[in-house]
Regions:
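Transmembrane alpha-helices of multi-pass small-molecule transport proteins
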Residues: 1-32, 57-63, 113-120, 135-153, ...
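Loop-to-transmembrane alpha-helix entry segments
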Residues: 16-21, 50-53, 66-88, 100-104, ...
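Membrane-interface helix termini and inter-helical loops of multi-pass transporters
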Residues: 42, 88-102, 149-167
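Specific alpha-helical transmembrane segments that line the substrate/conduction pathway
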Residues: 1-3, 29-30, 38-70, 110, ...
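Helix-helix packing/entry segments at the starts of transmembrane helices
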Residues: 49-55, 120-142, 172-200
Length: 200
C-alpha cells in the first residue's frame, strides 16, 4: 500500500543501479524481519519479544563499527544500559520452555535483520531519493512476504470494511509518516543512531 502511494513521487527522480540493488536487499530483509517478529510474538511473551527486538540498535552499532564507521561513546553507554534492561526482561523466559526460548531467538534474529535493513537503507539512499527508495523497498517487502503468508494459509484479502479502514490508517500513519521518516533520517544520520529511536 505504501509503495503505491509513494510511486508518483518516486517516478520524478532518477534511479541508480547500486541504489536500487540496496533498496531491493532492504526490502527482502525487512520482510524477513517482520516474519521473525510475528513468529516471536506467537512463541514467546509480547514483553520479552518486543524487548529483544529492541536490541536492533546494538546490532546496528556493531555492524557500523565492523564496517569502519564511528559510534559516539554516549551511544554505546545508552545501548549498554538498554541491553541490561533487555536482559532482565528476557532472562525470565529463557528458563520456561523450549518454545519460548525459540521465540526469544527469533526475536533476536529479527533485531539483527532490522539492523541490516537500516544499514541497507542508508547505503541505498546515498544515490536514491527517499521516495524512490521507500517505493522499491516497500514493494519488494510485500512481494517477499506475500508467498510466505499464502503458504502459511493466512487470509490476506477477506477483511471487513472496518479492518480495511484500520489498514489504511496504518499505511498513512505508521508506514508513511513513521517508517518513512526513519528512512529519511538515514540520509543524514548513522543507522546506529537512528536505530536508538526504538528505545523511546
Amino acid at each position: 500500500g505504501g509503495s503505491l502511494l509513494t510511486l508518483p513521487f518516486a517516478l520524478r527522480h532518477p534511479r541508480d543501479k547500486a541504489g536500487v540493488k540496496w533498496a531491493v536487499i532492504a526490502g527482502v530483509v525487512l520482510a524477513l524481519h517482520f516474519v521473525g517478529f510475528f513468529l516471536a510474538m506467537r512463541m514467546t511473551t509480547v514483553a520479552a519479544g518486543t524487548a529483544l527486538v529492541a536490541l536492533q540498535p546494538i546490532f546496528a552499532a556493531l555492524f557500523v563499527k565492523l564496517s569502519g564507521g564511528h559510534i559516539p561513546s554516549k551511544a554505546w553507554l545508552g545501548m549498554i544500559v538498554s541491553f541490561v534492561g533487555v536482559g532482565l526482561v528476557a532472562g525470565v523466559d529463557l528458563q520456561i520452555s523450549t518454545d519460548k526460548f525459540l521465540g526469544d531467538l527469533a526475536a533476536i534474529i529479527s533485531a539483527a535483520l532490522a539492523a541490516v535493513y537500516m544499514i541497507a537503507g542508508s547505503k541505498a539512499q546515498r544515490t536514491l531519493e527517499t521516495t524512490t527508495y521507500t517505493t522499491i523497498c516497500y514493494f519488494i517487502c510485500s512481494m517477499t512476504a506475500l508467498p510466505m503468508a499464502l503458504i502459511a494459509g493466512y487470509e490476506i484479502f477477506s477483511f471487513s470494511a472496518k479492518e480495511w479502514w484500520i489498514l489504511l490508517g496504518l499505511i498513512l500513519g505508521a508506514q508513511l509518516l513513521g517508517h518513512s521518516m526513519f528512512n529519511s533520517a538515514l540520509k543524514r544520520v548513522s543507522p546506529a543512531v537512528v536505530s536508538l529511536i526504538v528505545f523511546f
